[in-house]
């Protein structure tokens, strides 16, 4: 997978990317732009979002993805600027340190993670689908996680539950709207070498080591590798891929024992 793809599968299409200011979102904005898409960068961090939009020659819309009115305005801005909403990569999310074992995680921490990781995906799908229905075509990619498929001994209870919700919602929407030309898939990355992961594991190196040893490929993913998967799901190359949990996890979910 390359950061500078020669294929241009998305020429003329409009892609809305939430959490576009950093990590997977930024890498995906770059990749989709390289493949010819118009990019609408959404982020609550104005400086990071503007930088992403400038780099990808796209549009920045400052967005709190937990606010229904701001989410509606985001997709309206995409349509007003470029004339269509073809791709929605609903990716914004958090993984705060106070989300831990169920025994230690407070209700406010639980609610905050659910709002950002799950409710935001609901709001973004709800806003994007009407545009895609009118067009008769569209691809929605929602960021879930490999932990939506597997239990984790190093628990982040609200994060895991939120990503399980994203997985189930994506499956249902993919089935519901398939005959209207809309595909909905859940992207399930393994641990990715992003600022979010580095911040989390810097505070707990032992936790990082425990994660790393279980990855058959022996390393964390790079954000551009996840972006390549998003580009595939956004493109017509995945025209028969729908309502799936699309795993990009380096083999974690397929490993019965830890590789030597």
Where are these regions (language model features)?
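The beta1-alpha1 cofactor-binding region of Rossmann-like NAD(H)/NADP(H)-dependent oxidoreductases
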Residues: 46-47, 63-74, 107, 224-225
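Substrate-binding pocket helix/loop in short-chain dehydrogenase/reductase
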Residues: 99-102, 106-111, 211
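Active-site helix of classical SDR
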Residues: 125, 162, 170
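Alpha-helical segment proximal to the catalytic Tyr-Lys
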Residues: 130, 175-179, 239
């Amino acid at each position: 997978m390359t950061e500078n793809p020669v294929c241009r599968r998305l020429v003329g299409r409009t892609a809305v990317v939430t959490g576009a200011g950093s990590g997977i979102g930024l890498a995906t904005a770059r990749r989709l732009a390289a493949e010819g898409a118009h990019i609408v960068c959404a982020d609550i961090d104005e400086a990071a979002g503007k930088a992403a939009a400038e780099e990808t020659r796209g549009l920045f819309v400052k967005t709190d993805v937990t606010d229904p009115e701001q989410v509606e305005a985001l997709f309206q801005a995409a349509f007003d600027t470029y004339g269509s909403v073809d791709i929605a990569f609903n990716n914004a999310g958090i993984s705060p340190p106070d989300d831990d074992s169920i025994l230690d995680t407070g209700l406010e921490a639980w609610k905050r993670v659910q709002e950002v990781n799950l409710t935001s995906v609901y709001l973004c799908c709800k806003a994007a689908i009407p545009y895609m229905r009118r067009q008769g075509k569209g691809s929605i990619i929602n960021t879930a996680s490999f932990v939506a498929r597997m239990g984790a001994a190093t628990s982040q209870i609200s994060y895991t539950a939120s990503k399980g919700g994203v997985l189930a919602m994506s499956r249902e929407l993919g089935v519901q709207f398939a005959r209207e030309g809309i595909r909905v898939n859940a992207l399930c990355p393994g641990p990715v070498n992003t600022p979010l992961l580095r911040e989390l594991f810097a505070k707990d190196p032992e936790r990082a080591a425990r994660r790393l040893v279980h990855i058959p490929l022996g390393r964390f993913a790079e954000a551009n590798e996840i972006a390549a998967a998003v580009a595939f799901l956004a493109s017509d190359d995945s025209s028969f891929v729908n309502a799936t949990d699309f795993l990009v996890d380096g083999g974690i979910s397929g490993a019965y024992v830890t590789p030597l």
